[in-house]
Amino acid sequence: MKVLVPVKRVVDYNVKVRVKGDGSGVELANVKMSMNPFDEIAVEEALRLKEGGKATEVVVVSIGPAQASETIRTGLAMGADRGILVKAEGTVEPLAVAKILKKVAEEEQPGLIILGKQAIDDDSNQTGQMLAALLGWSQATFASKLEVEGSDFKVTREVDGGLQTVKLKGPAIVTTDLRLNEPRYASLPNIMKAKKKPIAEKTVADYGVDVTARLEVLKTTEPAGRKAGVKVKDVAELVSKLKNEAGVL
């Protein structure tokens, strides 16, 4: 079974995000970029399937600028076999991403597509679901456990108030939650090996997908600053402030 893993290049989660002066978006110049953390979990799970004899090949695909090849190399250094870079400039909205991934899936014919439940830059949580609808495949979102049973998949999902287990007919699409696994760190030898692994380069035009933006960002702003807290001497003072100042009692 071949596993296809879409990954996204995003601002590193350790970086403090800065909004552009004109409010048109987030400042990306000279900012450290890395693989979306949820996608790292997807790559790790695909590699575990291969190591467990359930998968034969892991292919990483990314849609974005030429620099997205660095994100693919991260996946290759973790252990993926090869990569596909679909070059696209500017913001590519989830529906367009799903349409491109549909074309890639039709070419690659994977038995499983596993991707992060959302990207930490836009938090859309849409691509996996849209891709499943376009392909007509089974899907399970927010996976915290994934098991392969022949050509089927058993997925435990994180839902409000507990867990839900579903069984999918392959081929299928699974989106990952944080508790699915802990991604490995790429070793130095594997980082060096990744430089020699193949990355096929495509363009959006190769797949005939219209990536024209259908959404307009009106304004981007930073979260409002929080009012500083105060220390109280005792319970009586706390109750007084909650009653007279906060008005919650």
Curated annotation (Swiss-Prot):
Database matches in Gene3D superfamilies: HUPs
GO molecular-function term, one example from the UniProt record: electron transfer activity
InterPro entries tied to this protein: ET-Flavoprotein_bsu_CS, ETF_a/b_N, ETF_b, ETF_beta_N, Rossmann-like_a/b/a_fold
SMART domains: ETF
Statement: the UniProt record of this protein carries the keyword DNA-binding: no
Keywords: Electron transport, FAD, Flavoprotein, Transport
CC cofactor note: Binds 1 FAD per dimer.
CC cofactor: FAD; AMP
Function: The electron transfer flavoprotein serves as a specific electron acceptor for other dehydrogenases. It transfers the electrons to the main respiratory chain via ETF-ubiquinone oxidoreductase (ETF dehydrogenase).
Assembly and oligomerization: Heterodimer of an alpha and a beta subunit.
Family: Belongs to the ETF beta-subunit/FixA family.
Name under which the protein is recorded: Electron transfer flavoprotein subunit beta
The organism of origin for this protein: Bradyrhizobium diazoefficiens (strain JCM 10833 / BCRC 13528 / IAM 13628 / NBRC 14792 / USDA 110)
